[in-house]
Amino acid sequence: MEKLKILNLNFSFQRAAHYHINGGMLLMGVVLLAMFLANSPWGDIYASFWNYEVHLQIGEFNFFSHNGHHMTLMTFINDALMAVFFFSVGLEIKREILVGELSSFRQALLPIVAACGGMLVPVLIYYFMTAGTPAQSGLAIPMATDIAFSLGVLSLFGKRVPLSLKVFLTAFAVVDDIGGILVIALFYTSHLSVNYLIASAGILLILCGGNFFRVHNRWFYIFWGVIMWYLFLQSGIHATIAGVVAAFTVPATPHYKIGKYINRIRENIAVFPASDKESVVLSKMQINVLKSIESSSDRVISPLQSLEDSLHGMVNYIILPLFAFANAGVSLTADHGGLEVGMATWAVLAGLLAGKFAGIYFFTWLVIKMGFAGLLKGMTWVNLTGICLLGGIGFTVSLFIANLSFGDSPVLLTQAKMGVILGTVLAGVLAYLVLQFALPKQPAQE
């Protein structure tokens, strides 16, 4: 039974990793396209395109407006579509906490400590480089790791990569996501509307009630999650946080246990009419039995797993590429003709490249030397170096926090984005070079 559980977890991880890896490759292409357009003769058209307003209006009510402002395409992507991304992240975090690499203290300790170091050191480096300057407010930018990009780079080595390295990278990236979510919720709240917060709390009670009373219809959680998103948008708390909060209320237990499901399938097979095996047209009785099997199959998959599986494709192949296409198009030249770089650029670059590596590596070394954890199977101090460098690929959440930090300062925003893109590229290249040397030449034995 334990072996079956482990196999199921590995299958779940590998399926999720497949989406992340392919999505990471797509992101790379989209970033290059956005950079090309932003620095081409069509740069002004590219920049102005994202300022078109988005409306969903019924009478006088516009669903995509808040505080008297209408959403543009850019804010629709960053505030609405990215809420779906954070909903998916919330589902992944909940799964990891319940049955994954964060489900036990000893399992979780190494990636949690590594992630804490990977968040703390970049923030400190950024702070000391920008203290007392307008760029200081972006100190959370270099604390994130982009799981899709980093797994995309790791996938270039194919079966040479031990599964333990992929699991470790994914686990500490998930903890990074938790840190990023907390930062967004706590430090990027512009104002608070008590009435909308109270209404949001009411919706949260409905969602928690659905979980408590075992409501397994996933549309229940989607509907009330969308309402919560709108209330968060109006409340002043960043709307994407609604996605995470709603995700944590989605049930992780299926309606049917495996044993009951197997019995139901056997019962249906026993009554399935098979008199004419050559017929290409099913009888009404056969259709009814097959529908019963389909219904039972739906009920053995928990709402959490069902939603996570359904959203992976949309998030990795539509939402994140759109986000990258809208946000990564940075003009490389300033008005004076030079590169658009400044203190924010160098601080983000140092945080992602040096801070991430030093924080993850040192904190991992510390917790192992203190005897609280050990290196995972297939992990060495040399290939760990490459994984620590991959932690400096901060793309998606780093760009997202940059928008929140410098939304009112286009110059600082551009400088920070330059730092994110440079840091991501350099971290990816250095990680590739280190892992090319550190990983075994033959496929890893699991």
UniProtKB/Swiss-Prot annotation:
It comes from the Bacteria. It is a multi-pass membrane protein. Keywords: Antiport, Cell inner membrane, Cell membrane, Ion transport, Membrane, Sodium, Sodium transport, Transmembrane, Transmembrane helix, Transport. Pfam families: Na_H_antiport_1. GO terms for biological process: regulation of pH. The chain crosses the membrane at residues 23-43, 73-93, 109-129, 138-158, 167-187, 193-213, 219-239, 314-334, 348-368, 381-401, 419-439. The keyword Ion transport applies. It catalyses: Na(+)(in) + 2 H(+)(out) = Na(+)(out) + 2 H(+)(in). GO terms for cellular component: plasma membrane. Its main location: membrane. One of its GO terms (molecular function) is sodium:proton antiporter activity. Gene3D superfamilies: Na+/H+ antiporter like domain (1.20.1530.10). It is found in: Cell inner membrane. Na(+)/H(+) antiporter that extrudes sodium in exchange for external protons. PANTHER family: NA(+)_H(+) ANTIPORTER NHAA (PTHR30341:SF0), SODIUM ION/PROTON ANTIPORTER NHAA-RELATED (PTHR30341). Belongs to the NhaA Na(+)/H(+) (TC 2.A.33) antiporter family. This is Na(+)/H(+) antiporter NhaA. It comes from Phocaeicola vulgatus (strain ATCC 8482 / DSM 1447 / JCM 5826 / CCUG 4940 / NBRC 14291 / NCTC 11154).
